A protein has these predicted regions:
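Short alpha-helix in the alpha/beta-hydrolase fold that links the catalytic acid
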Residues: 42, 168, 182-191
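Acidic catalytic loop of the alpha/beta-hydrolase fold
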Residues: 177-181, 209
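Alpha/beta-hydrolase active-site loop
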Residues: 73-89
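Short beta-strand/loop motif that positions the catalytic acidic residue
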Residues: 165-167, 172-174, 178
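Hydrolase active-site cap/lid region
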Residues: 113-151
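Conserved alpha/beta-hydrolase
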Residues: 46-68
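Catalytic histidine-centered segment of alpha/beta-hydrolase-like enzymes
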Residues: 206-218
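The serine-hydrolase catalytic nucleophile loop
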Residues: 33-46, 184
Length: 231
């Protein structure tokens, strides 16, 4: 049964979410850029939570999916603020953050902001610093559909230029042939993380979406393995 659609307010923005009660740690899914909580990976993870009795939270950033607002007004800082509020207000205890593409970038920031609560991270085609390596400048970003405000916000939240002071287990899954997020970004992220427990799984022939059945299976097996100590 699909969890009921609900909303919470932050700064006058109505953020849509679905929460499935269960035992912890709570799984929290963060969608990618221009995506939402009803995508295939989110639904497969929700089904996994149902089968295993896990609590799970998924939500839409403002301007996406069922949340209020205009997509073009969104910035990485704004969506980080909403993501932090969702974790703080809607979950208790330890969480496992699962981020797709841009959502992976946000999970890194959440782990830095709430190290005492984040038990593990899973980055699916994680796109850390994509405003940095994806575009030469604000004008290039704008031509590709990324607003100037979003680009500036992303530049202020870059992580890959130094050590990322995260110590929890981190799992990165990345497609060998990802056309949107170069595989090198996954290697850079792995090297930048301070944690000694970091694993990168390169999926042969995989693209960016990683939504094929065998790719979904790899994601679910990764999440399940991280949860084993909590069984």
């Amino acid at each position: 049964m699909t969890p009921e659609l609900a909303h919470f307010d932050i700064g006058g923005r109505e953020i849509a979410y679905r929460y499935r009660p269960g035992r912890g740690p709570t799984l929290v899914f963060l969608p990618g850029y221009a995506s939402d909580m009803e995508g295939n990976k989110a639904l497969e993870l929700d089904a996994f939570a149902t089968r295993t009795g896990r609590a799970m939270l998924r939500f839409d950033y403002s301007g996406t999916g069922s949340s209020a607002g205009r997509f073009e007004d969104g910035t990485l800082a704004l969506w980080l603020e909403e993501s932090l509020a969702a974790v703080d207000r809607l979950t208790d205890g330890p969480v496992v953050l699962i981020g797709s593409s841009m959502g992976g970038w946000l999970t890194l920031h959440l782990a830095l902001l709430r190290p005492e609560r984040v038990q593990a991270l899973v980055l699916i085609a994680g796109a850390a610093d994509f405003t940095d390596w994806g575009f030469e400048d604000a004008e290039t970003a704008e031509r590709k559909g990324i607003g100037r405000a979003f680009w500036r916000s992303g530049q202020e939240l870059r992580l890959l230029s130094g050590e990322i002071a995260i110590d929890c287990p981190v799992r990165l899954l990345h497609g060998e042939n990802d056309p949107d997020v170069p595989l090198d970004v996954a290697f850079r992220t792995m090297r930048a993380l301070r944690s000694a427990d970091v694993q990168l799984n390169v999926l042969k022939g995989g693209g960016h979406r990683l939504s094929e059945p065998h790719e979904i299976d790899a994601i679910l097996r990764t999440v399940a393995a991280l949860l084993e100590p909590a069984l």
